[in-house]
Amino acid sequence: MTSEELLQRVRKIEIKTHGLSRNIFAGEYHSQFKGRGMAFSEVREYQPGDDVRSIDWNVTARMNRPYIKVYEEERELTVMLLVDVSGSRNFGTQSQMKRDTMAEVAATLAFSTIENNDKVGVIFFSDQVEKFIPPKKGKSHVLHIIRELLSFEPAHTGTNINAALEYLTNAQKRRCTAFLISDFIGAFPQPLPKGKGVTDPVTISSRKHDLSAIQIYDRRDAEMPDVGLLKVRDPETGVRVWADTSIKSVRDAYAKAWRGQQEALEEMYNKTGMNHVSMRTDEDYVKKLMQLFK
C-alpha cells in the first residue's frame, strides 16, 4: 500500500467512523462507561455503617483501630483497544477482510473515546505483543491509531490472548475500559480440555478492568462451502492441505471445530461475566456494537 493509498483509506475510515461515534455512540458511551472507574483517594477512620470490605488492614494494624480506604469516581476514563493482528485477520470471503472490519470497529470506539475527552490506547497482539500505543487524547492521536490499524504488519502470525491481557494488566495499573477485538481463532487449544476455557490472565484482567470481547469473523470461518476439491491454507501456521468439500463429513468436522471454539468462548464469558458481542464481516457492526452500550 502506497502512502497516498494509506492516506485515502485513513480519510475514508475517519469520515465513516467519526460520524458514527459522534451521532450514534456518544450518549450511550457516556452513560455506559463514564464513571465506572474508581480511584483511591484517602484513608479515614472506620465509622458505623461503612463497608467492612474497604478496611485497610495495614493501616488498621499500625493505628490499632480500624481505617478504611476511600475511593472517588474517576472523571477521566482510559480506554484500551486490544487488537488481534494474527494471520487469520487477513481473510475475507464477503464484502471485506476481517482486518478491515476490525479497523473500523476500533476506529469507532477510539473516536467515541475522544468525543468524551477520554484517553485511548492500543495493544496490537499476535502470539505476543507486537506494538503498544500509549493512551492519549485528541484527534491526531486517533488518526495515528487508524494508520497503524491499516498498515501495521506483525512479526508473528499466531494468536495468544493471554500475552495481550498480561501486558494490559502490567501496563495499566489503574482500572480501565478495555475491548478485546479478535476472531479468537487459535486462541484456545482444540480439542478443548475440560474446564480449561478460562485462563488466569483472562480472569485477572476481567476483575481488574472493565473488559469486553468483540468477536469479528467471516461466514466461512464457521462453515465450509460445498465447492469440491479445495486447497486450504491455515493463515496462522502456513500449513496447506487439500480438502474435498463435497464430502459431508469433511464439512461437518470443519463446523464442529468452530463450535468447539465458540463453546470455549461461552465458557470464558460465563465464568468472568465479560460483556461480549459477535459479528460477521457482512453484518452491520453498528447494531452489534450498540449491544455493548446497553
Regions picked out by a protein language model, each given a short descriptive name:
Residues 1-32, 42, 170-174, 200-294:
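Von Willebrand factor type A / integrin I
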Residues 1-136, 177, 187-188, 222:
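An amphipathic, basic-hydrophobic helix/alpha-beta surface used to engage anionic
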Residues 194-198:
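A cross-taxon signal for low-complexity, glycine/charged-rich
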